[in-house]
Amino acid sequence: MNAPDPRDQLARPLNNPFAEALDKPDRYVSFCGIDCDGNARILMQHIRRHIDDPTKGNAFWDKFRDKLEGRSSERCDELFLVHSYINMIRELFETYEDDDALALLQKIEEECC
C-alpha cells in the first residue's frame, strides 16, 4: 500500500476558521477583525450627542455620564457600559430616531455582546 503524498494536502484549501473570521467576523469563532472597543467609543459619541443636550437629559443619563467619566466610581470602559445598559441605549436612540446609532448598536450587540 502506498503512503499518502504530503504534496496532495498542499493542493487542498485549508479550513482555517481564524482566516475566515477576517473575511466575515464571527465572535463565536474569533474576535479577529472585530473592533468592539473602537465601535463602543464611536457609540459613546452618539450617546453623548443626546445626553449632553440639557433638553434631553435625565437622572439616569447623568449617572451614566458619571460612570463613563469615572466621577461616581471607577471609570467603566465604553464596551462594559454598552453591555450593561444596551436596552436603555436602544430606547434613547429610538426616542430620538437616531438610525445611524441604532445600526451601530445592533452591530455591537451582534459582534461583541
From Swiss-Prot:
This is N(2)-fixation sustaining protein CowN. The keyword Ribosomal protein does not apply. Coiled coil: none annotated. The gene is cowN. Belongs to the CowN family. Keywords: Nitrogen fixation. HAMAP family: CowN (MF_02117). GO terms for biological process: nitrogen fixation. Is required to sustain N(2)-dependent growth in the presence of low levels of carbon monoxide (CO). Probably acts by protecting the N(2) fixation ability of the nitrogenase complex, which is inactivated in the presence of CO. InterPro entries: CowN. Pfam families: CowN.
